[in-house]
Curated annotation (Swiss-Prot):
Keywords: DNA-binding, Nucleus, Transcription, Transcription regulation. SMART domains: GAGA_bind (SM01226). Expressed in seedlings, leaves and pistils. Detected in the base of flowers and tips of carpels, in sepal and petal vasculature, in pollen grains, in young rosette, in the lateral and tip of primary roots, and in ovule at the exception of the outer integument. The keyword Transcription applies. It is found in: Nucleus. The gene is BPC2. It comes from Arabidopsis thaliana (Mouse-ear cress). InterPro entries: GAGA-bd_tscrpt_act. This is Protein BASIC PENTACYSTEINE2. Belongs to the BBR/BPC family. One of its GO terms (molecular function) is DNA-binding transcription factor activity. Transcriptional regulator that specifically binds to GA-rich elements (GAGA-repeats) present in regulatory sequences of genes involved in developmental processes.
């Protein structure tokens, strides 16, 4: 029993043992004396279950139980008073009705209360929906690759095995003194201004450029430019038209074109000195 004289719900005693000393009394006084609220005076958050263990429950909202006592009074006034041993099986639903009543009230409160969602929770839910929508979006199907033809693979293998042949040089025909002459087969001209023959560079379309002399300098290699990084001072130049005139002069003198032509004395006196990158 509790300090208030209320029996624990976890234990059950027969009706005869409970009302043993009250057989000669009226039933009305015992019920009024033992009538207590359905929730005991202790902490309502701790409730004892049928196995004797305490279960944590949410605290119920305060409600008035006067209407329940009024119905009980009407019910017990209708019962006959007997001196014989009464049947208390119908009068002891209190131990079982209190938990069921509390469960019904708890369920009723859950259905009636509609919790209001905060704005932050609503924003979080909308963000989750957006992320789920992005994640659930089906990716674009990749286009299937076309199967490679075996014939093309065989052709590629055959091409790799065959040595590449350099394309033939284009013939550059010039009419020298009425005679057509292919200058693409001529040896590369040289310049001997430094005392040693130095091959000239090709310049433009059919022209040549000196690698060792300018209008003021005669040295090999030419010095680097102080104004542009990675560039050398360019040598004197000769266009295709000027080179044709040189060939006409040498052909009239009977020069053997099997030997390289020395352009030392054939450079233009007004040669330009541009900056070019020589690799």
């Amino acid at each position: 029993m509790d300090d208030d004289g209320f029996r624990n719900w976890g234990y059950y005693e027969p009706a005869a043992a409970t009302f043993k000393g009250n057989l000669g009394l009226q039933l009305m006084s015992t019920i009024d004396r033992n009538t207590k609220p359905f929730l005991p005076g202790r902490d309502p958050n701790l409730m004892m279950g049928p196995n004797g263990s305490y279960h944590h429950q949410e605290p119920p909202i305060h409600m008035s139980y006067n209407w329940i006592n009024q119905q009980k009074d009407k019910f017990f006034n209708m019962l006959p008073v007997t001196t014989a041993t009464p049947n208390y099986g119908n009068v002891l639903p209190e131990t079982s009705s209190a938990p069921s009543m509390q469960m019904n009230l708890h369920h009723h409160l859950q259905t009636e209360e509609n919790p209001v969602k905060l704005e932050e929770e609503i924003v979080v839910q909308t963000k989750k929906r957006k992320t789920n929508a992005k994640a659930g979006s089906t990716p674009k199907a990749k286009k299937p690759r076309k199967p490679k033809d075996e014939n093309s693979n065989n052709n590629n293998n055959n091409n790799t095995n065959v040595t590449r042949v350099k394309p033939a040089k284009k013939s550059v025909d010039l009419v020298i003194n009425g005679v057509s002459m292919d200058i693409s087969g001529l040896p590369v001209p040289i310049c001997t201004c430094t005392g040693a023959p130095q091959q000239c560079y090709r310049w433009g379309c059919g022209g040549w450029q000196s690698a060792c002399c300018t209008t003021n300098i005669s040295m090999h290699p030419l010095p680097m430019s102080t104004k542009r990084r990675g560039a050398r001072i360019s040598g004197r130049k000769m266009s295709q038209g000027a080179f044709k005139k040189v060939l006409e002069k040498l052909a009239s003198d009977g020069f053997n074109f099997g030997n390289p032509i020395d352009l030392k004395s054939h450079w233009a006196r007004h040669g330009t000195n541009k900056f070019v990158t020589i690799r």
